[in-house]
Amino acid sequence: MHDQQELANQLSTGSAHAGCILDEPATQRCTQFLELLYTWNKVHNLTGTLCRSEAVSRHLLDSLSIAPLLKGRRHLDIGAGAGFPGLPLAICRPADQWTLLDSRGKRVAFLRQACATLELTSVVAVHSRVENYRPTENFD
């Protein structure tokens, strides 16, 4: 089992290679997100990833790898599920506005709890099917 510092080091090094430099508070938020995900996953089966180290590389770093490609400031994550890629990207780019859309209530409940716990005020989790969703503003 990996400790928090090992995961933080893996995340810090990997995010730099992915082109999304995380400062220490952002790295800490990502590892907190991972712990929250694992706590919820025991009951709600949000992701099938086996170990935390794998989750860093398969989920967090994969999500962060698209950060340099994003244009604009308003983003929509359709089928947000367990929060990938939306939540890691929101941690990496906190000045942007993020809407995480999912049709399953348990996932949206997790996303809302994660946003509250991590104090991600630029993120809104919406419980809706994409074909029924009517945003009040356009996304970039």
Residue spans for each PLM region:
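Class I SAM-dependent transferase core
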Residues: 2-72, 113-123
